[in-house]
Amino acid sequence: MSVVGLDVGSQSCYIAVARAGGIETIANEFSDRCTPSVISFGSKNRTIGVAAKNQQITHANNTVSNFKRFHGRAFNDPFIQKEKENLSYDLVPLKNGGVGIKVMYMGEEHLFSVEQITAMLLTKLKETAENSLKKPVTDCVISVPSFFTDAERRSVLDAAQIVGLNCLRLMNDMTAVALNYGIYKQDLPSLDEKPRIVVFVDMGHSAFQVSACAFNKGKLKVLGTAFDPFLGGKNFDEKLVEHFCAEFKTKYKLDAKSKIRALLRLYQECEKLKKLMSSNSTDLPLNIECFMNDKDVSGKMNRSQFEELCAELLQKIEVPLYSLLEQTHLKVEDVSAVEIVGGATRIPAVKERIAKFFGKDISTTLNADEAVARGCALQCAILSPAFKVREFSVTDAVPFPISLIWNHDSEDTEGVHEVFSRNHAAPFSKVLTFLRRGPFELEAFYSDPQGVPYPEAKIGRFVVQNVSAQKDGEKSRVKVKVRVNTHGIFTISTASMVEKVPTEENEMSSEADMECLNQRPPENPDTDKNVQQDNSEAGTQPQVQTDAQQTSQSPPSPELTSEENKIPDADKANEKKVDQPPEAKKPKIKVVNVELPIEANLVWQLGKDLLNMYIETEGKMIMQDKLEKERNDAKNAVEEYVYEFRDKLCGPYEKFICEQDHQNFLRLLTETEDWLYEEGEDQAKQAYVDKLEELMKIGTPVKVRFQEAEERPKMFEELGQRLQHYAKIAADFRNKDEKYNHIDESEMKKVEKSVNEVMEWMNNVMNAQAKESLDQDPVVRAQEIKTKIKELNNTCEPVVTQPKPKIESPKLERTPNGPNIDKKEEDLEDKNNFGAEPPHQNGECYPNEKNSVNMDLD
């Protein structure tokens, strides 16, 4: 079973896996642990990762990058429209209103959704993990920013489903970092002590996130999170690009923004310059050859100029930090440590601002690039039954407050209730009880739209169906279970109607039995490890009761314990009288929970038909990539064979082919090379396979002759040594050597016969081989000589290694030192000396066991 953590970033990705020795970040086929989040489309296949980034400038229009933030957003989203201006590829609206990415693939124009593009990247990460683990990868944990909304999280889950990944959890970036930090700490306070507060700061390529976490032994709780979704390393790059665009326009009269390739080159060089300025404070040059119109451009920048240029961005760093302390009601003095991760935190000015705010040195004990992936892998190992991990509970936080709105039964007024406040513990479940006579709707939305970096506050509309009044006309009690699951997604998991059914007196089935028969497990039984009782909201609305359940590590049931006790008093009286003889015959009441279907209309969720179509399309593209790779491998094999043999025919292979064949083969190799670069440039795989077989018919015998000429003398030498060894033993046997006089003469004759036969065979084949030229096939091959050596050893070795029979020597009686004493006298002496000091004989001391004392030795 695979245990994989995936950190899917805006600029790059990291893969961490759990092995027997711990968590390891694995490398791709380029021996790089960083895989760029780039997909390039060509006329034959897709390239993903490092190969795609290498051709980002030459194939700018068909290379897709920086698409992570497009998840779950509509095309007319203001953020999409702003980002569209800076992209090298085209964005178009899809039929469902989402963002479509238009590229040329396989010679045709294609539209791909963001889910499909992310699925392509996940395909590459999955392939890299499988190549490292040598087994299929299915289960994984994927990281998402903590500010991702319900729609964005559902979109990422759809992308994972397209590629066949079972995402056990969508884990917030900062929670993954905190888990990676805390699980290895051995000095955390115990559960009954004050927790250690640690603040984690992450500035990546496109976003800035901070979180405060409380640590106890074996426990992590996220107290709060804050963020700026539009502040990251990319913004610092943009400041440099704007500066040099203006400088080049003045200095060289070149408008870099007019050509996308020039602009992309400038972005790459500015990113390199930014990294160099992190370790150098002096002036650093920026040089680009043939930038535009065959002109070379140059510029320079130092760290102080860079910080002055980015002063506005640096001021934004403190805003999320203040927000975090305000949310969590913490003071700077309460923070034990500040840990930074993310590539952009390497900028000295960023580190200085963070350290100055908290008034303490910042810590860099975690790997800034790989911390998120490692935390995801740890979470996957905790969730996987295949690994035994130190017990460590993780309680996340809800980033945005969530409320429900509904219409009152037969009234025009609406009811509103905040079910999850900001930074509420997650995952968490609550039960709401409604009094209704018919079906009703619940609409979930974010209570604070201004604080959500998403234009739509609505989460979804949920219709509870098949609700009916009681037989006596009273309203039915409908229990609705709302939940924020392990992915951070809000859902209404179950709904049930409490129905009172009259029964005959002789029916003795209990209410508990009927409830068990009518209950069924929830559709998504996530494990609530950190749920707390919360009844503070109960009674805020006349028709709503809010309950929470203190759940264990078993999946929560749809019927909560705290709710079962809230039965009308009349019903309780009837329950108490079940076992008592009735004064008069009255119908008994049974309470039955009837499961109700829920229709969910979400703001963002791919339909099943569309999802299946995406899965099929991805499968076809994976197969096309595989076929193209096999075709390229076959073509490269022909090209490699041509170059290898042409060099060796004029070198070590020259003596092993006759002159005429030598010239013909060289001519064939040259013709094959010309064919590869002309009509053979784009052929089917079989054409290259046939061409390679044609070359190998001539080249393989030459290669074999060379290899045989190298190996044959070594094998003859080894055979000669073995023959000499056994012949010497046979001669020693004839000379009556004591070492071999135990061997039977008939056995030794077998050795002599085998030695003579093999020696005769060796002399014959060596003479025959000496008469042949090197350009002829060998008379005897090295493998045949190796077989002869094995046969010789099998015949002779058991005989010559026979051990000599052992001769038993007569037993000698041990005579003690000193005069012989009669046995009876010895016994008497022993009795008289009972408890005395043990005797010393031959320098040995025999301890008296009865008087021995157990001692502790240092």
From Swiss-Prot:
Source domain of life: Eukaryota
Gene3D superfamilies linked: 1.20.1270.10, 3.30.30.30, 3.30.420.40, Actin, Chain A, domain 4, Substrate Binding Domain Of DNAk, Chain A, domain 1
Residues with the N-acetylserine modification: 2
PTM text: Phosphorylation on Ser-509 may be important for regulation of the HSPA8/HSC70 chaperone activity.
SUPFAM superfamilies tied to this protein: Actin-like ATPase domain, Heat shock protein 70kD (HSP70), C-terminal subdomain, Heat shock protein 70kD (HSP70), peptide-binding domain
Keyword 4Fe-4S: no
GO cellular component entries: cytosol; nucleus
GO molecular function annotations of the record: adenyl-nucleotide exchange factor activity; ATP binding; ATP-dependent protein folding chaperone
Modified residues annotated as N6-acetyllysine in this record: 471
Complex and partners: Interacts with HSPA8/HSC70. Interacts with HSPA1A (via NBD) and HSPA1B (via NBD).
Family: Belongs to the heat shock protein 70 family.
Function of the protein: Acts as a nucleotide-exchange factor (NEF) for chaperone proteins HSPA1A and HSPA1B, promoting the release of ADP from HSPA1A/B thereby triggering substrate release. Prevents the aggregation of denatured proteins in cells under severe stress, on which the ATP levels decrease markedly. Inhibits HSPA8/HSC70 ATPase and chaperone activities.
Protein name, entry field: Heat shock protein 105 kDa
Protein source organism: Pongo abelii (Sumatran orangutan)
Lineage: Eukaryota, Metazoa, Chordata, Craniata, Vertebrata
